C-alpha cells in the first residue's frame, strides 16, 4: 500500500505542478 500511495502522490504532483504552472501563466497573460 505504501508504494502505491507514494506512486499516486508522485503521479498527482507530476500532473498538478505543470497544470498549476500553466494556470499561473494564463492568469498573468489574461491580466
UniProtKB/Swiss-Prot annotation:
Pfam families in the cross-refs: PsbM
Subcellular location: Plastid membrane
GO terms for cellular component: photosystem II; plastid membrane; thylakoid membrane
InterPro entries cross-referenced by the UniProt entry: PSII_PsbM, PSII_PsbM_sf
Keyword Electron transport applies: no
Coiled coil: none
Record flagged with keyword Ion transport: no
GO terms for biological process, alphabetical: photosynthesis, light reaction
HAMAP family: PSII_PsbM
Protein name: Photosystem II reaction center protein M
Organism of origin: Cuscuta exaltata (Tall dodder)
Gene: psbM
Amino acid at each position: 500500500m505504501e508504494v502505491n500511495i507514494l506512486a499516486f502522490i508522485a503521479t498527482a504532483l507530476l500532473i498538478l505542478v505543470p497544470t498549476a504552472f500553466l494556470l499561473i501563466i494564463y492568469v498573468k497573460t489574461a491580466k
